[in-house]
Structures are given as structure tokens and as C-alpha cells.
Amino acid sequence: MISPRMTTNLLPARTISLVSNGGAATASPSSPSVAARPRRPSSGTGRGKVSAITLDDYLPMRSTEVKNRTSTDDITSLRLITAVKTPYLPDGRFDLEAYDSLINMQIEGGAEGVIVGGTTGEGHLMSWDEHIMLIGHTVNCFGSRIKVIGNTGSNSTREAVHATEQGFAVGMHAALHINPYYGKTSTEGMISHFESVLPMGPTIIYNVPSRSAQDIPPEVIVAISGYINMAGVKECIGHERIKHYADKGITIWSGNDDECHDSRWKYGATGVISVTSNLVPGLMHSLMYKGENAVLKEKLLPLMKWLFCQPNPIALNTALAQLGVARPVFRLPYVPLPLEKRAEFVRIVEAIGRENFVGQKETRVLDDDDFVLISRY
């Protein structure tokens, strides 16, 4: 039997006559080659009967209703987007109470959007069920107060399409998409990958070669910039690339906290997608909204450099635990910063002012035994 799933939506419906002769099935000359199970010969004749199989078009499991009524302009206007941390319970499950508190503190501090399940939020350590659940939870609880941008990208186009369909189905306002990593593709392959997800809703493209091991060249961004759902680019290459896109009218967010002030005020960036704003959302809001401020920039630089002394989100996880706003639980392979770096963070908080950081508890240096490392969850 031939399953309709063997066809694609590029093939018209057709009738193919399969004639069994001595148990051997052959397709009619006008039909494409079709693999079919041979029919058993009819009793007493040695010849099978002619059978007709109708192959219907492949029908995608999609609704024609609009799933996302967020306009791209609603996304391109955002100045401060936080790549939010995902906190855990001691058994490794999501700590939704702590997560909700973090989101509320982002809203109160002036963040206009959050990336859910990004690198900072450890989406790569989640199952897709966890990932989509957290996006849906964020939308249901906070979607009227802050834009929810789900990281539904993947190095597999099939996975990216499926996750993005699910993300928009549960209400996310926009999607974040990285280029295919590890199993890298060509420039044309990148364009095709992004074109597969752009029709679904507002989309931010994420260029971070230090993680993906492949730069998204400007010709890829220019090629897809005409799509109505192309919201812009989170760019980690640096100021010159940001200026290149800004000069072309393409919305661009800095992906480097230590460069975001100059990117915003000197090179044309719309704003920043930030890690640092997990800790000091109010100060990051000022950095993006209140004009050039070299004093504030220099004040925050030690914190920004500390946050990236080891691969993100190791330092952020350590910091939030020491501030008392998240449990000191790490999903492996992440482990906390060494003791001297933990002590350095306390000094940085004192220099900037505890009142500028999230949470109300006194900052303290945690001991090694305070941390819980989870390998099964």
C-alpha cells in the first residue's frame, strides 16, 4: 500500500494503475516510478486484477486563522530585551515561582521584551516540551505586559519549523532564530532555512559566530530583509556590522553588553538583547534610553566583563544565586564560578550599589557545598 505521506504538496492528485502480472507490479508508462507491494495472483488465473490508487495532495496540518497578531513594528521598537535566566528546583525542574519573580523584576525595571529559552535561559538543556511550556507560561502570565520572544531556532530546519509553529500557537510575540550550527550549511542554505520560518510571525535573526561557528554574512540578511516578518538581527560581530545594517534601514540589536552603549548611540543600533539586564534592568534601561552616558557605561563595564569571564550563563547563574533570587541549582554541564570570582561579584555589587540589583536579600559569597549540580532531570 502506498501511503499519501509519500507524496508532497508539489505533486498533483493522480490515479496510478498498477497491473500485477505473476505477482510483479508495474506502473503505467505515464506514471512516475512507484514502489508498491506486489499483489497476490488471483486464484486459478495466475494474473492479478487491476487496482487503482488515488494519491491525494499532502495536506499540511495548519489553520488558516491568524495565529499571531503582533506586528513586526511592535518588535522593532523594543530597546531593551532581556535574555532571561531559567531558574531550577533542586530536582532540576523549573522553579516557576522564582522565574515569575524574575520576569516581574524585568517589567518593573523597564525591560520591554524577554528572550525565553535562549542561550542564557539554557534552551539547549531543555526538552522541546519544557521549552514550549515555558514560552506558553510566560505568555499566559505576562504577555500583556512584556513582549515574549521564544528561542525556537535549531540547526535542523524541520525542528525549527515545528518548534516555531508551536511557539506561535501558544502565543509568543516573536521568534529568535540562529543559523544552522555544527552541521553548517551554505549561504543559500541559510537563506532557505530562514525563509522556512519567516512566514510564521515576527522573527529576529541571531548571529553569534562564537557559538554557531559560522558567521551569517550580510548578503543573507539583505536577501531576507524584504519579508514582512523580518524584525531584525541580534548581532554579535561588532560595531561595523551594526552600522552596515543600520545604514540599510535594517533593525539591529547589539548582542554584546560591553559594546551596547556605543552601538546604540554611535552606530545606529535600536537597542540591546542583554544578559546584564537580568541583574540591573533599571540601569540597562537608562543606558538604552537616556542618551550617551559615559559615566554609567564605565560603571557597568566591570560587571559586564565579570559576567563573561566564563561562557554565559555560568556567571549569571552564580550571581543570581548569590543575590538570593534563584536557587543555587545548575543543570550540568554548567558549574558555578570558582570562589575568588564569587567574592569578586560581591565587591562589584557594593561598587554599583545593591539597590540597583534585582532582589532584596543581602549579597553573599556562597560556598561550594551550597550549590546543587543536576545531571538527570
Swiss-Prot record:
This is 4-hydroxy-tetrahydrodipicolinate synthase, chloroplastic. GO terms for molecular function: 4-hydroxy-tetrahydrodipicolinate synthase activity. GO terms for cellular component: chloroplast. Keywords: Amino-acid biosynthesis, Chloroplast, Diaminopimelate biosynthesis, Lyase, Lysine biosynthesis, Plastid, Schiff base, Transit peptide. PANTHER family: 4-HYDROXY-TETRAHYDRODIPICOLINATE SYNTHASE, CHLOROPLASTIC (PTHR12128:SF57), DIHYDRODIPICOLINATE SYNTHASE (PTHR12128). Pathway: Amino-acid biosynthesis; L-lysine biosynthesis via DAP pathway; (S)-tetrahydrodipicolinate from L-aspartate: step 3/4. It catalyses: L-aspartate 4-semialdehyde + pyruvate = (2S,4S)-4-hydroxy-2,3,4,5-tetrahydrodipicolinate + H2O + H(+). Catalyzes the condensation of (S)-aspartate-beta-semialdehyde [(S)-ASA] and pyruvate to 4-hydroxy-tetrahydrodipicolinate (HTPA). The active site is at residues 206, 234. The record marks 119, 182 as: Part of a proton relay during catalysis. The gene is DAPA. Its EC number is 4.3.3.7.
